[in-house]
Design a protein with these regions (language model features):
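Conserved SAM-binding loop of SAM-dependent methyltransferases across substrates and taxa
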Residues: 10-23
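Short glycine-centered segments of the SAM/dcSAM-binding site in methyltransferase folds
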Residues: 2, 25, 95
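The conserved SAM/SAH-binding core of class I Rossmann-like methyltransferase domains
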Residues: 4, 27-30, 99
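Conserved class I S-adenosyl-L-methionine
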Residues: 2-9
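Active-site segment flanking the S-adenosylmethionine/decSAM binding pocket
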Residues: 53-98
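S-adenosyl-L-methionine
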Residues: 29-71
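C-terminal substrate-binding/active-site "lid" region of AdoMet-derived donor-dependent transferases
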Residues: 84-144
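Helix-to-beta-strand junctions that scaffold the AdoMet/dcAdoMet cofactor pocket
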Residues: 21, 48, 90-92
Length: 150
């Protein structure tokens, strides 16, 4: 299956996708040039040069050169226009998953959930932190995740 990983960051989603099945391929799309080298280094570390393609730029200009995705993950930079663009190219039985940490992005995902349905989740992550000789849970970012299947 084909994954588009938009806002790929470190490439971890693309890497896990490729490791999940020997025929899976991924396209890691990232606007930030400083992250491209990190994705490429991680791709090499896992020996995925043949199945993980790294693209620098915006999905709006890159999409026309990519194969139709079976799944799309948006990890950053989500906008309403981007969601509509991605939904238009999804084939039958395809999946869209979006993570959001900012209030603005989270509000957008709530709106799209009400519009299209799917699944909406709030993921809370905490890490242990020492305090006064004891340990407490220190909350990290709350993540809202919307997933949608065609």
């Amino acid at each position: 299956e084909v994954l588009w990983d938009i806002g790929a960051g470190s490439g971890s989603i693309s890497i896990e996708w490729c490791l999940g099945h020997p025929k899976n391929v991924a396209f890691a799309i990232e606007r930030r040039r400083d992250r491209i080298s990190l994705i490429k280094a991680n791709r090499k570390k896992f020996g995925l040069q043949e199945r993980l393609t790294v693209k620098h730029g915006n999905i709006e200009t890159i999409a026309k050169d990519l194969p139709t995705p079976n799944a799309v993950f948006i990890g950053g930079g989500v906008t309403s226009d981007l969601i509509y663009q991605v939904i238009k190219v999804l084939g039958k039985n395809s999946r869209l998953v979006i993570n959001a940490v900012t209030l603005e992005s989270q509000a957008l995902l709530l709106k799209k959930y009400k519009q299209f349905g799917g699944n909406l989740k709030k993921i809370n992550i905490s890490k242990p932190k020492p305090i006064g000789g004891k340990t407490i849970w220190s909350a990290q970012y709350n993540i809202i995740q919307w997933s949608f299947k065609t």
